[in-house]
């Protein structure tokens, strides 16, 4: 499941995904691009079955959309939802400083709500970040139902997460991705996601470009119709 969706083949988790693909009899792909990648890698000549089934994360998002709950904290009426936790950002003090300088400036315009990952908090403390003077609305990490509520009610998503890029799309929100690459290239190709790395000016400019942009095209369902799990089950029942 989630076969061929990778962004950097030198990362341990991506290597594990490739190895899992190699030993699998059925490869369930979430997107057209993932299916195309497998064919280009020669899987059409290997004794395996390739099935495009859609994304099981969208199944979950649609199922829980009406079951979400607001975090038990005071939140601004309009806000940007942000997460920062990837090692390439948190372990590089220069990247981390650039990202948070951009977020501080953005939060002057539209409050940035940021569930703070423990590793990110420790790294910020390590570079002398002054939380008492910050304009960002830091909150404790939230559960899935609270995150769904934040996704449904935010103006825009800013993240370095892989999954949150897709979840932003599921809930009709543009995403500013603070990474240099993404496994979800169809979101970039269709204009729903912008890669900005850790460039402060690019982060701020892309926020300004997308925060009030008309939300069009989200109905195209790049990841299926929310029935990926059923398609997987149907394929397995034919074995």
PLM regions: where:
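Short beta-strand scaffold positions
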Residues: 1, 29, 52, 115, ...
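Single conserved hydrophobic/aromatic residue that forms the stacking wall/gate
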Residues: 1-6, 10
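Alpha-helix C-terminal capping/helix-to-coil transition sites in glycosyltransferase folds
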Residues: 5, 22-23, 152-153
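Membrane-proximal helix-turn-helix segments that form the acceptor-binding/catalytic region
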Residues: 14-26
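A nucleotide-sugar donor-handling region in carbohydrate enzymes
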Residues: 23-95, 196
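A donor-sugar binding/catalytic signature common to diverse glycosyltransferases
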Residues: 27, 150-187
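Leloir-type glycosyltransferase catalytic cores
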Residues: 33, 194-239
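Donor-nucleotide binding loops and adjacent catalytic segments primarily
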Residues: 67-153
């Amino acid at each position: 499941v989630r076969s061929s969706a990778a962004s950097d083949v030198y990362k341990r988790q991506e290597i594990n995904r490739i190895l899992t693909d190699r030993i699998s009899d059925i490869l369930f792909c979430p997107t057209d691009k993932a299916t195309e990648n497998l064919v280009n890698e020669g899987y059409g000549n290997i004794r395996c079955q390739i099935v495009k089934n859609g994304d099981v994360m969208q199944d979950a998002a649609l199922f829980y959309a009406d079951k979400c709950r607001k975090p038990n904290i005071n939140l601004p009426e309009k806000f940007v939802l942000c997460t920062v936790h990837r090692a390439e950002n948190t372990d590089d003090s220069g990247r981390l400083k650039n990202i948070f300088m951009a977020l501080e400036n953005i939060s002057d315009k539209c409050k940035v709500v940021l569930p703070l990952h423990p590793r990110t908090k420790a790294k910020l403390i390590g570079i002398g970040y002054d939380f008492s003077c910050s304009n960002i609305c830091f909150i404790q990490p939230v559960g899935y139902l609270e995150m769904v509520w934040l996704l449904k009610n935010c103006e825009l998503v800013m993240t370095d997460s892989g999954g949150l890029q897709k979840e932003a799309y599921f809930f009709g929100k543009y995403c500013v991705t603070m990474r240099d690459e993404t496994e979800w290239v169809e979101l970039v190709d269709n204009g729903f996601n912008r890669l900005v790395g850790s460039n402060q000016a690019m982060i701020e400019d892309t926020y300004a470009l997308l925060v009030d942009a008309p939300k069009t095209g989200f109905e195209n369902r790049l990841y299926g119709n929310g029935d990926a799990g059923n398609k997987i089950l149907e394929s397995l029942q034919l074995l």
